[in-house]
Amino acid sequence: MKKTIITIIILALSWTSYAQSIIVEDFKPVCDSLTRLIQERTTVKGALKTKAIMKRGNSLDFYFTESLGDLPWYSEDAKWFRNTLKSLFPEEYSQYKLGEIYSRRVAFNRLVTPHLTYEGQPAESSHRIAKFNNGRPLVRKMDSQKFSKGLDGRNIALWQSHGRYYDQRSERWRWQRPCLFQTCEDMFTQSFIIPYLVPMIENAGGYVLMPRERDIQINEIIADNDTTYAGEGGRFIGRYEENGSWTDAGAGFADTKAIYTGTENPFTLGTSRQCNTISSDSRKTAAKIIWNADVPERGEYAVYVSYKTLPKSTTAAHYTVHHLGGETEFVVNQKMGGSTWIYLGTFEFGKDKEGWVSLTNRTPKGYRSEAGTVVTADAVRFGGGIGNIARQRKSQDGEEYAMSVSGMPRSAEAARYWLQWAGTDPKIYSQNEEEDDYKDDYMSRGDWVTWLSGGSAMNPKQEGKRIPIDLSLGFHSDAGVTPNDSIIGTLAIYTLKSEGIQKLPSGENRMTSREFADIVQSQIVNDIRAQHDSLWSRRQIWDRAYRESRTPSCPSMLLELLSHQNFADMKYGLDPAFRFTVGRAVYKGMLKYLSNRYGVPYAVQPLPVEDISVSFGQKSKAVIKWRKKLDPIEPTAAPTGYIIYTRVDEGAFDNGKVIETPMEKDGLMSVEIDIMPGHIYSFRLAAFNDGGKSFPSEVVSIGIPEEGDSEKNVLIVNNFDRISGPAYFDTPNYAGFDNTLDSGVPHIKDIAFIGEMYQNRRKLDWMSDDNPGFGASFDDKAGIPVAGNSFDYAAVHGKAILKAGYGFSSCSNEAFCNDTTLCSGAWTVDLICGKQLTVTDARGHQNFTIFTSQMQDAIRRHTANGGNVIVSGAYIGTDIWDLVYPVRIEKDFRQQSIEFAQNVLGYKWQGGFASKKARIVPYGDTATRAIEFHNVQNSDVYCVEAPDGIAPASSSAQTILRYEDTGVSAGIKNQGNGYRTVCLGFPIETLKNEDDIDAILSLCLTFLAE
């Protein structure tokens, strides 16, 4: 009997399975139709598949594979999908109702996420939790603005993908991804995060924690109470000074060795210090520690502090950083984050200038002093440094293998090595018995987030650093190519289950990560389509068990922005403007997700101001004017106030001052600042609102001579606002980037460039990371920043002009064209054209023309009033007579521009690539030393690959400079109708020697003054 029953059950199950398979087969055409319709509706490609279709009474329940969850779903789309699915039922199933829908075992309605919002209010979210108010954040800058609608008090864990690692199998250090299109993923994703995303989060009030070194500075100075190692590789010893009643606080950091091996933890090799706190109004003398930097060369250095977290640690440790721009004060909550590196900020320090960090036991004003608390102190670190973690193949048979360090900046290395240097538990970064650093690296990043948050409200049941992490994001690029060179696009990944559990340690449902991933992906795609490419591909939103999205203790996602293997994607990927757009989109996605999560309003930080200028006012006043820039995508990004930053002479910019009541006229804002003769004053502005502050504007500078001709003032116009990727060529068989033609212009500096591309044959496929086929590039320049457009050349020119005895003011090119008052009283206009050039992006959008119609009109107005002109730039002829990028110039505009150059400025084009050796000599003078300019990429100033030959256009002009190697005319002087011009086919600011800059501008000014 038993056997009979079992047989019947088996047969029934078999029949059920068979019946289901028939139904699934019957619905295949339906799935195909839905796949097409979904793509038409959402633009997302997929292949909808059913795993099972179950009859339940007179209803059909659909169990789709993960293919359903891989698509974005909003409430109206979900409703449309149900209606469309029912309408497509085959005839034989038309009598059935549509029942439940699942993606694997997830109910369809759980996949629905709220739409991206733009009006500043949180969307209704099923994953909203009580607002978490981090009232005592890990790090807070004192006297800084608080952004109630930004990310104030939020802690965000963020990392760029991969990094240099030691491969035990091949016994060498190598990249985790291939070198393609002048970069590799290990370095490429940094170029979005470090210069853009991180400062945007910080400008909104958030604090960023990273498992990879964020500072590209190769020098590293450590000041500590313990003896510190100093040796080769940019490692230097700072000075430690201690005053007051400090006592031993137990084990702490010490840098005792040239290299660290295995899982050695430098935070256990030394000691730390402690002192009882006193209140802000205490009459006791405060105890103090000073860590002196003694930096070896001027530059920007990240500052990290360390301390010990004890049961009675203070929540208000008062640190002060003294740097070239002044002093910046911080309050650090030492109840969390002990025995690791805690980042305060990046500051400019000068060689042989006082630079230090101090810590006092006095509680800062405005912070409550808790009785019986202590402040602790350990080492302070300045600069990122060079990697000092040595690795080797693990011995299996007693044989000793060679040990080596990467030899690269620590910022180029994988997370596994920084985590060791930062005192992380070896269980986090060494999970494979020292046999596989590749696995250790990707396994460590998400686990590190959990280690940081252990013991906090976000992760209360685990031990850790007690830092509440609000969210985490791993920023990657993907592989893959398209046969028609179309865009691969953007993929988002989250993980619904970790160890079979759908809850985060805080109790939240992990489905909140889908909402996070969808919002970030939506924001990226929408912004790219609006600003760069209307056809940008939105890929799927995956629920997959990737380590970086699975193990963090907070809402988390992994982003695959684009394909670093696809040429079409990388045309955008190397464009700094694209990187800014993406960085801003990711920041906005984080902001809007946290708004939904906590149910709080938001405001997007403003864009930088435009039309900026500085001019002479009354009685030694400088008048700074600017225009606010509204964001057409984000209505909440309108500015409500402004901050002005000031630099005097060779100093650094100060911490900024809020402009209380700026004047406004005709849409231009203005403020007056006192200035003194004999000094160069430089200014930049940032706009702010309740959501944060913008990136700084370009720099404008002004100076009044102590002696000289104060009546003859020079207006410096920065007509060099280009930022772009390198020149490229694109044919059916050959394509690539061509740095010999033009290497592009980074924004400030490029940290992604590793070497030039050498393989341009499209048909070559990837064979290995060492032989990656089309796009293959050298990596000999990895870790060396490439200087770009600093937007700070008015001070360079102005310094030479001031030495020559003339005053100067400056403005942007937009301000020069739009504000006719700036030229009034200007004896000469010094037009900085730098490496300005008409360029086009991958979709044909053109920008950065040197002599636009507006610029030509402005110069004509100036010369018509007897004003002189100095023009210098690498492409002042090429951009008129020729082209570098595949741009389209209207015939009438080209002819108009040629006539302008010849008749107004007095020159004609003699050709590009006028010099290979980049050496200039005075015309007709063979005895004078040659003047050199930068023609190869370097870390100091942008380079000029192809200077222009500039010849006299008429008998009223004559050559004054020529290129030494070719004899081609490099510059001319011209006598116009009541005015004079000097035009140079190279940028003055790229000259290698400051004395040469002085000499060239003095030569120009002398002729104009004759």
Q: Model-predicted segments: where are they?
A:
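Beta-strand-rich modules
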Residues: 672-692
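Active-site microenvironments of hydrolase-like enzyme catalytic domains
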Residues: 395-399, 412-510, 542-565
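Active-site-adjacent mobile loop/cap segments within catalytic or ligand-binding domains
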Residues: 365-368, 379-387, 471-500, 531-599, ...
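A glycine-rich, often tryptophan-bearing local segment used as a flexible ligand/cofactor-contacting loop or short
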Residues: 835-944, 955-958, 962-964, 1000
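Pro/Thr/Ser/Gly-rich low-complexity, intrinsically disordered linker/stalk tracts
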Residues: 593-636, 677, 691-712
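Short beta-strand-plus-loop segments that form exposed binding edges in beta-rich domains
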Residues: 358-373
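A short beta-strand element within beta-rich, extracytoplasmic domains
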Residues: 276, 287-311
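Helical hinge/lid and interdomain linker segments adjacent to catalytic or ligand-binding clefts
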Residues: 754-891, 991
